[in-house]
Amino acid sequence: MASAQALKFRAAGHARQKLWGILVRKERWALSWRGWLIVLAGVSLTFYVFLSGIYPFLAVTHRVNSNILVVEGWIHEYAIRAAVEEFQSNSYERVFTTGGPVVGIGGYINDYQTSASVGAELLKKDGLANEFVQMVPSRVMDRDRTYGSAVALRNWFREHNMPVHSINVVTEDLHTRRTRLLFKKALGHDVAVGVIAVANPDYDSTHWWRYSEGVKDVFSEGAAYLYAKFLFNPSMSSRDEKTVVRNAVNSKP
């Protein structure tokens, strides 16, 4: 009778206690080997989808119909050469380079010590005529540089009364999706933004996880995209840009 009552007690989901409730014994469900096999298969599938899908997700190429090419000035020379080929192979009329102060100089000094200026000179060196190239420097560095560069481009269009309905932006592979997101935020819904990803020739993008540089690039750009997508505040960035500009003006002799 007592054994039957104990079984009934446990079947009802009650715990057994000893030592005045200090020790408790409970029955619980646990995964069987079949259950663990299913969990392992699910984890493996998720991991495979991540490895095979994250790179093409970040390094997206999607051109729009446009006669304006934008080149992020900080990109490496292999990407600059790809931008020159893109310009010469299509019906572009102008190419704009963007970017803030060159890394390592401690902040904005003048427009000619910016990534926009460096990128413009590299485009000319690789064969583009001066008449096609226009640098659009930004004074923003450190935080939200891509958005600051896009805002500087938007302001240049407005100041020069240049109506723009679409652009294509050349940048480096894993930065592309974030570039499109931030340029869209800066330029607004009336401007279609296309992007062109230039692959890093130093590693095989289809097996990026085999290379330390590939792992670093994927995780850093993935985290940066999540920040831009869910945490970035354009109004805060605009206030920071105004502060940088004001400080640069005040520092002039």
What do these predicted regions represent?
Residues G21-V60:
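N-terminal type II signal-anchor transmembrane helix
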